[in-house]
Amino acid sequence: EEKWSKIWSEKVLSNKDSDASFSQVIPPPNVTGTLHMGHSFQYAIMDFYTRYHHMSGKDAHWQVGADHAGIATQMVVENNLAKKDVTRKELGREKFLKEVWSWKDYSEEKITSQIKRLGCSVDWNKYRFTLDEGCNDAVIKAFVELHRRNKIYRGYRLVNWDPSLKTAVSDLEVVRQEK
């Protein structure tokens, strides 16, 4: 397996001279942990499509990357610190951010290793992280444009508030209990 994983990770499927193209973006896994079976299943299907289009003569590109997962990553790092009886407030902003980036590097390395072991036909030279400068700039530009068109706005709405994190959280992050 190691031999073939190395061979495939060094190959870039490309038909640059083709007029036809196919591209897809890997739904970026969060740097909160490692890949699970669902990722493997999805990546196998996406790999099939990329290879199929390449063999059909198209310039096929499968964009690979990882997502920062903001609050979820913060929670993972805080939980790891709690095991050492340390809080983010005790660390201070700079040291805490250093811990977060350290965790990101650790988790990202595990994730990329897993994707490589799956033999996915991605172009590792074009790897992206959602907090890379280009990605971040694109998000800011999109929000500014959506705000300019009145598609998003600031207003009064009910939100799920986490009193310990002191921020709004998504419905997916809420543990509901009936009392």
Residue ranges and their predicted role:
Residues 1-179:
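N-terminal, positively charged nucleic-acid-binding surface of large information/translation enzymes
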